[in-house]
From Swiss-Prot:
Keyword presence, ATP-binding: yes
Quaternary state and interactors: Heterotetramer, composed of two GyrA and two GyrB chains. In the heterotetramer, GyrA contains the active site tyrosine that forms a transient covalent intermediate with DNA, while GyrB binds cofactors and catalyzes ATP hydrolysis.
Organism, scientific name: Mycolicibacterium flavescens (Mycobacterium flavescens)
Domain called Topo IIA-type catalytic: residue spans: 1-554
Gene: gyrA
Catalytic function, reaction form: ATP-dependent breakage, passage and rejoining of double-stranded DNA
GO molecular function, one term: DNA negative supercoiling activity
GO cellular component: cytoplasm; DNA topoisomerase type II (double strand cut, ATP-hydrolyzing) complex
UniProt cross-references to InterPro entries, sorted A to Z: Hint_dom_C (IPR003586), Hint_dom_N (IPR003587), Hint_dom_sf (IPR036844), Homing_endonucl (IPR027434), INTEIN (IPR006142), Intein_C (IPR030934), Intein_endonuc_central (IPR004042), Intein_N (IPR006141)
Lineage: Bacteria, Bacillati, Actinomycetota, Actinomycetes, Mycobacteriales
Enzyme Commission identifier(s): 5.6.2.2
Protein family membership: Belongs to the type II topoisomerase GyrA/ParC subunit family.
Protein's name in the database: DNA gyrase subunit A
GO BP: any one term: intron homing
Predominant cellular place of this UniProt entry's protein: cytoplasm
């Protein structure tokens, strides 16, 4: 209560809700925040117990603002149809500490489109970066909540955790629902994406000259057609036999006048280590991004068979920024990858499971002859996948086995089989559910294994310094939106002097304390309550079929 005293500055509503949920009410934050809002509304309580700062609704049933939390402006907010936008670019030139009305459709935690109606530029604050073992990152303030998978008394539960509460070894939720696509790509955007991907991988654009080469004649011709259509101007084409006895096809451009006027002009003079996905491409729909990734992987990507009947798809680059961008764009298609720095200094993005290789082949693929090689490797695998991969629900197997309520024969089957891997649920989900007797256990298992989420282990939470931070107000019950694949949540408050009277002398052995739900902290059985809240503000309830109401008193 010391943080929320009336003689101190207002604290973020997020912090109040998170501490209540973490210590006393592990059943979601909506009811906690609704209660906080009601206690701040003078038309709801005769004597409000919370001093709210911000939009806490109105007597005319205008809804309160969502709890405000903040991430850095470079975070990519996911939009419908596979589009995305940097948070700082939602409102160009937004002033520090400003509220900006918007009308933007974003995706919520389930991958469904919802409306964001406000962008908050919250000024500059201390920030922290959450990084997963795979290399996914998001940076935000200490009070920014991310959706996590938490063990609550042995039950794997989706709960919000503040960045300051997240520790290495925790599991954060990444949204990986493939985008909804609507119609074919605009031909100009598709051509621009094709030759952008090709030139980033196997081309160069210096101040005075540009070029591209590739061994695949059909892919080379596709890039050449795109170049002539989008850029135009003089260029030279040739072929030569290289040391491996392969025929290399080359495009050479000496006059860059036309090229500099096109979107390829962004690459002029760019070093290999500085390559990145341009902002216009992030805002493009999935059908355009797919063309870019196909060309990119056909250039510097590869696929190969690994032991234990699995396949690796990888991309190598000298640019750490490009590797990070590629990993993020793959995630937008639902493909999970790992990012790391090789001993040679190259940054690698790799898919090391059969399931992800199959998803890559189906959702994206290579842009040329390498796709046939990948499909051949996949076709050669046995029909049923063997072994274990990293795509699983932590704690699910133990929970199901302990609480299934099943017959002995079904319990024995559940104990002997791997039931926490997503690949197993996709293949044998009906059989697993048929062996779980308890309907609540079945419901929990189905929600966690429907494929929407990837449960990524946190590798580190590090200080990222003071940065400008932003947030969105989303017009839904849980106020969720997607930032860099992480599920983000989105008023400030403090107690009133009357509320402090309800807590006065609580630390002086005036009431009894008992362990909370998980035994980590103590909670009071009652409040000292020198202020008679039930009489002053009134109350109501139902017990044994009889309604009881106490009207408010002066």
């Amino acid at each position: 209560r010391g943080i929320f005293r009336p003689d101190r500055s207002h604290a973020k509503s997020a912090r109040s809700v998170a501490e209540t949920m973490g210590n006393y009410h592990p059943h979601g934050d909506a009811s906690i925040y609704d209660t906080l809002v009601r206690m701040a509304q003078p038309w709801s309580l005769r004597y409000p117990l919370v001093d709210g700062q911000g939009n806490f609704g109105s007597p005319g049933n205008d809804p309160p603002a969502a709890m405000r939390y903040c991430v850095t402006g470079d975070a990519l907010v996911r939009l419908p149809f596979g589009q995305s936008v940097r948070l700082r670019d939602v409102v160009a030139g937004a002033r520090s500490s400003s509220d900006n009305a918007i009308d933007l459709k974003v995706l919520n935690r389930h991958g469904d489109p919802v409306v964001a109606d406000k962008l908050f530029h919250s000024g500059e604050h201390e920030t922290y970066t959450v990084r997963t073992a795979e290399g996914y990152e998001v940076t935000g303030t200490a009070n920014h909540p991310l959706l996590c998978l938490v063990d609550v008394g042995g039950v794997p539960t989706l709960l919000w955790k503040l960045t300051e509460e997240i520790r290495p070894g925790d599991h954060v939720v990444l949204q990986r629902t493939p985008p909804t696509e609507f119609g074919p790509a605009d031909w100009q955007d598709a051509f621009e994406a094709l030759h952008l991907g090709a030139f980033i991988s196997e081309g160069f654009v210096s101040e005075n000259r540009a070029g591209f080469n590739n061994l695949d004649r059909e892919f080379f011709n596709a890039v050449l057609t795109a170049y002539d259509t989008i850029v135009g101007g003089p260029r030279y084409v040739s072929s030569r036999t290289i040391a491996s006895d392969s025929l290399l096809h080359e495009l050479d451009v000496h006059n860059l006048t036309a090229l500099k006027k096109s979107r390829l002009g962004e690459l002029v003079g760019q070093r290999s280590a500085d390559k990145a996905v341009p902002e216009w491409l992030w805002k493009a729909p999935a059908v355009v991004k797919r063309v870019f990734l196909q060309a990119l992987f056909e250039g510097d990507g590869s696929c190969s068979a690994l032991p234990r009947n699995t396949i690796q798809v990888s991309y190598s680059t000298r640019s750490g920024r490009l590797a990070k961008d590629i990993q993020q764009m793959l995630l937008e298609f639902g493909v999970i990858s790992r990012r790391y720095v090789h001993a040679t200094g190259e940054h690698k993005v790799v898919l090391t499971s059969r399931a992800q290789a199959e998803l890559f082949a189906a959702q994206i693929g290579f842009g040329g002859i390498k796709q046939a090689k990948l499909q051949g490797l996949l076709d050669a695998l046995p029909q049923a996948a063997a072994g274990r991969d990293g795509d699983y629900v932590p704690g699910l197997a133990q929970f199901v086995r302990k609480h299934s309520g099943s017959r002995w024969v079904d319990k024995d089957w559940l104990n002997r089989h791997n039931i926490d891997r997503l690949s197993r649920w996709q293949r044998d989900g009906a059989e697993i559910l048929g062996r779980i007797a308890d309907p609540d256990v079945r419901a929990i298992a189905q929600e966690l294994t429907d494929g929407r989420f990837y449960y990524a282990r946190v590798a580190s939470v590090t200080d990222s310094g003071v940065q400008p931070v932003y947030s969105l107000r989303v017009d839904t019950d849980d106020h969720s939106f997607i930032t860099n694949g992480f599920v983000s949540h989105n008023t400030e408050a403090r107690l009133t002097p009357l509320a402090m009277e309800m807590l006065r002398e609580i630390d002086e052995e005036t009431v009894d304390f008992i362990p909370n739900y998980d035994g980590r902290v103590q909670e009071p059985t009652v409040l000292p309550s020198r202020f008679p809240n039930l009489l002053a503000n009134g109350s109501g309830g139902i017990a044994v079929g009889m309604a009881t109401n106490i009207p408010p008193h002066n």
